[in-house]
A protein has these predicted regions:
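Long, positively charged, glycine-interspersed low-complexity recognition regions
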Residues: 92, 104-171
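Short glycine-enriched, charge-decorated loop/helix-capping segments at active-site entrances
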Residues: 98-102
């Protein structure tokens, strides 16, 4: 019962935390405020009904959830040529720590190396443009496009509201 309760609490927090954020304090405590008055109109029952629908439950029966380092995961599932992978890794910024686990530049290098040199599947990545990230993926056979994104939320001015992103593919 406890894992089910944890799943339910996680679902609730993701849906009702401010701007869908999920972060922890340096002490390991969840520290995102409630979403505010606009969230009062969110219909939790409607969302729960969708998650109980036959179509989605059928899909979930074929779904496996992993909690692994990305490289362990990819080496476990061994994506093939007819697979497609969408990647949304943490940004190359000072604020890239989730649940007290940093995603470092070494992790960014490992990810780029695996995706460019070992991954047989087609893949697409969206990530904030930095010189470091651009340099990792500016390789033959890799396509890089840019697009601008304006965020509504920027906590304590840690993140720029206007950001250029990279859309990176191997096809």
């Amino acid at each position: 019962e406890i894992p089910i309760l944890h799943c339910a609490l996680f679902f609730f927090m993701r849906n009702y935390a401010y701007s869908g954020m999920f972060r922890y304090s340096s002490k390991g405590d969840f520290n995102v405020p409630y979403g505010g008055i606009a969230y009062n109109s969110k219909l939790l029952n409607k969302k729960l009904a969708y998650y109980k629908s036959k179509e989605l439950l059928s899909h979930f029966k074929k779904t496996k959830i992993y909690n692994l380092d990305f490289e362990q995961f990819l080496r476990t599932v061994k994506p093939k040529e007819n697979d497609f992978i969408f990647l949304d890794p943490p940004y190359d910024s000072e604020f890239s720590t989730y649940a007290q686990n940093a995603f470092t530049r070494d992790d960014q290098k490992r990810l780029a190396n695996y995706m460019i040199n070992e991954c047989k599947a087609k893949w697409m990545m969206i990530i904030k443009n930095t010189d470091f990230i651009y340099g990792l993926y500016d390789k033959e056979g890799i396509n890089i496009r840019t697009f601008d994104k304006e965020y509504v939320v920027s906590f304590m001015n840690r993140n720029d509201k206007k950001v250029t992103h990279l859309l990176i593919t191997n096809y």
